[in-house]
Amino acid sequence: MKYQLDAREARVIGCMLEKQITTPDQYPMSLNSITTACNQKTNREPVTELSESEVQQTLDLLVKKHFLRTLSGFGNRVVKYEHRFCNSEFGDLKLSPAEVALVTTLLLRGPQTPGELRTRAARLYDFSDVGEAESTLDQLQQRDDGPFVVRLAREAGKRESRYRHLFSGEASDAAVLEEESVNDNSHPLAERVEALETEVAELKRQLAALLA
């Protein structure tokens, strides 16, 4: 895959995608506004404290990679940046509004479940239900020019698997294999739980008969 963003690059791109939707009157963005967005305390995982010089270095790298372009002159007192990451006349990556919302939220907060993504992406796109979020994740996984997301191993005690973006490289085989292993082993456990529930119900019935 041609997208190989490091952590800072992913944070910058995620912030610019987010602000383009939520505060379009303040987009394109200056170095100061991008730094503020990167270090935002809400909707960020992890929370960072990047300096302007660190963000500037990242912006310069993204410009060289053709993921950003600078806007200056014509009355602009400061250099501003706009992304060319997706849905740009300069790039090939075209994403639907729902796909943009999920990709943005994954770039900003790392691996998340479909339920978490639906809730956290609400300001970017109004998913009708979790099913629509899952369907969009499937589309991102199955695109001919992708995949752009992958389902990770289900964490112990969790009902949903998390998804992560692939714009920073492929997920480890171990994560996918662990997911498959969890699924393979889930049937015997489910059967055992069902048997125990049946046994408890029978004991309750017998106890009720004795007390009658």
Curated annotation (Swiss-Prot):
Transmembrane segments: none annotated. It holds the Pfam family DUF480. InterPro entries: DUF480 (IPR007432), WH-like_DNA-bd_sf (IPR036388), WH_DNA-bd_sf (IPR036390). Coiled coil: none annotated. PANTHER family: UPF0502 PROTEIN YCEH. Belongs to the UPF0502 family. This is UPF0502 protein ECA2523.
